[in-house]
Structures are given as structure tokens and as C-alpha cells.
């Protein structure tokens, strides 16, 4: 914690004497509270991100970004360094036979969205080439929309045989290109963005708005401020189990009424622009959450799917 505070002190460009005085008079908890307040401020993130490229998103844990653009029939790999993305390679690909976003099983469409690579599957039929990289479709947002289907892979081509110039929904590359792609990434630290047409890059202003909003949302959650907390949710909010905003808000009001003391820590935050077929400016936020209260203890992944509308961040789905 001390290392975190010292690092943030210099990053924030605050007067060290002010924080030292605060520490001397009120203790380390007051210093931490002041720093947490700064995380809700636009000024901090403007300074922190000023030299960083966020075109493909903001990543604290992911090291590789795969960008698939269906209309262009191309998939590109980028490697993240400290402040930028290094272009690694680009390959032609084939995708679902039918255009558009995937909604139903068997529609022969490739989904638009953001997905993890969950597994390298080697026990595949020779029709799929040497192996397949399994994606996380359907994700939480897909499930909230009742999207159907599964088994969306990045795979190869049949050995010594021809095939159609399209798939049932997967992304497919020539086998040497698939093998070269896999050699150049760590699928456990990769994110896949699938866009229908040309990918819409994120802006620094969007990422800053999301980061400040996440920390304001966390603060409202921590302090059981139900009105402010719920203000971050869209009226169209829906969980994967189809729980809508009305029932969700009633559940949260009951929990917040207990006014329990709690600590909430976020780390390894990743923010990805979310290509979609709804005309929304969407992002997927993934982070590690450490939640501790007298009645609930949770350490694990937290995912938010949000849209920016009228310069506000609204949560559409959550896990």
C-alpha cells in the first residue's frame, strides 16, 4: 500500500508536503482517502494518459489485442508496450457465411463484440486444421440479450482438401498463418475485438470518462449511496440471468439499507471498445475485484458492459 501511495503521489503531481502533513495529522487512512478521491478526477487521468495510445483500449493486464474486421476479411495482432501498441502481423481470414451480428444458433453469422481466448484446443477434427483458439462467446452481454449459439473459434483450414470461402460463424485462417499467429501471442493475456466494418477507435476522452466514472461508482457502492450508485445504470440494464433494472434496483436498495462497512479494491483493469450492431458507443470493462464486508467476501473477476450516452457512462450489463 505504501508503494502504491508513493507512486500515485508523484503521478498526481501533488505537493508532497500536503500529503505528508495530512499523514502526520490524520494518519495513513486519510492519505489513502485523498488519493482515492483523486482517482475520480479528470485531471489525474489526463496527466496519466497524456503519452499513452488508447486507440484499441486501455489495458493493465492484457498484453495482446486481436482485431478482426469482417468486411475487410482481415485479422491483425498488436502487442501492448508501456505507452503504445506495436503492430505484429495481419492476415486474411474467412468468417460466417452471412453478414451481420450473431443472434441465433445456426444463423451462420460471426458475432460482433469483445471476447477472451479461453483455450487452445488441439483435439479438433482435421477440417479445422492443427488447432483452434476458443473464444468466450456468448459473453455476459450476449447472454443478457438472449443471443444463442456457441463454439466460436479461431481455427485453421482442412488438410489436403478444399473448403468453402466462409464458415458457420468462426474465424478461419490458413494453417501456417494460424500457427504463426499463435506463436506470437499469449492467449491467456489476449483480447479479441470483432467488428462488422471498420473498427471505431477509442478516444482518450472516452477512456478518461469511463475511468473517473468507475471510481465514482465504486465510491457510491462503498458508502452505500444508493441513489448515486443506481444513477450509473441504464434503464435497459439486464443481467445474464435476465434480471432487469427494476428488480436489480430493489435488490440493491435492500442490501444498501444495511449500511455495512466494506472495502472494495479494483486492480488489473482492462477497457475495450465494444463493436456492436446497436449503434451504441460501448465498452467492456474487466477487472479483479476484492470485496470484503461482514456478510460477503468475494475475490474474483468483475465485468461491466457500458455505453457512453449524453457524456455519461451507463451500465448495460454486469457480472
Q: Which functions belong to the PLM regions below?
A:
Residues 4-12:
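Sec-dependent N-terminal signal peptides
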Residues 42-151, 161:
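Gly/Pro-biased beta-strand-loop elements
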Residues 92-98, 154-158, 289-292, 316-319:
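Short, solvent-exposed aromatic-acidic interface loops
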Residues 107-112, 119-215:
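Exported/periplasmic cell-wall-interacting domains
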Residues 206-225, 232:
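Short, aromatic-enriched amphipathic alpha-helices that serve as compact interaction elements
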Residues 230-273:
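Short solvent-exposed beta->alpha transition segments
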Amino acid at each position: 500500500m505504501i508503494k502504491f501511495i508513493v507512486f500515485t503521489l508523484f503521478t498526481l503531481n501533488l505537493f508532497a508536503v500536503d500529503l505528508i502533513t495530512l499523514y502526520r495529522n490524520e494518519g495513513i487512512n486519510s492519505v489513502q482517502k485523498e488519493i482515492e478521491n483523486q482517482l475520480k478526477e479528470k485531471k489525474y487521468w489526463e496527466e496519466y494518459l497524456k503519452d499513452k495510445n488508447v486507440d484499441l483500449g486501455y489495458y493493465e493486464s492484457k498484453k495482446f489485442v486481436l482485431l478482426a474486421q469482417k468486411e475487410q476479411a482481415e485479422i491483425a495482432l498488436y502487442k501492448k508496450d508501456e505507452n503504445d501498441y506495436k503492430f505484429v502481423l495481419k492476415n486474411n481470414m474467412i468468417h460466417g457465411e452471412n453478414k451481420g451480428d450473431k443472434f441465433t444458433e445456426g444463423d451462420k453469422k460471426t458475432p460482433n463484440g469483445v471476447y477472451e481466448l479461453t483455450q487452445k484446443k488441439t483435439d479438433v477434427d482435421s477440417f479445422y486444421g492443427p488447432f483452434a483458439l476458443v473464444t468466450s462467446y456468448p459473453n455476459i452481454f450476449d447472454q443478457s440479450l438472449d443471443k444463442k449459439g456457441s463454439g466460436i473459434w479461431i481455427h485453421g483450414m482442412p488438410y489436403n482438401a478444399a473448403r468453402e470461402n466462409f464458415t458457420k460463424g468462426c474465424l478461419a485462417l490458413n494453417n501456417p498463418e494460424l500457427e504463426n499467429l499463435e506463436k506470437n501471442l499469449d492467449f491467456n493475456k489476449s483480447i479479441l475485438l470483432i467488428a462488422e466494418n471498420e473498427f471505431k477507435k477509442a478516444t482518450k476522452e472516452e477512456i478518461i470518462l469511463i475511468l473517473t466514472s468507475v471510481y465514482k461508482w465504486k465510491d457510491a457502492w462503498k458508502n452505500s449511496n444508493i441513489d448515486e450508485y443506481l444513477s450509473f445504470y441504464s434503464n435497459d440494464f439486464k443481467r445474464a440471468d435476465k434480471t432487469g433494472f427494476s428488480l436489480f434496483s430493489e435488490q440493491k436498495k435492500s442490501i444498501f439499507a444495511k449500511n455495512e462497512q466494506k472495502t472494495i479494491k479494483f486492480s488489473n483493469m482492462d477497457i475495450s471498445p465494444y463493436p456492436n450492431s446497436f449503434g451504441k458507443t460501448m465498452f467492456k470493462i474487466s477487472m479483479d475485484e476484492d470485496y470484503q464486508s461482514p456478510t460477503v467476501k468475494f475475490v474474483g473477476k468483475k465485468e461491466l458492459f457500458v455505453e457512453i450516452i449524453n457524456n455519461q457512462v451507463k451500465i448495460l450489463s454486469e457480472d
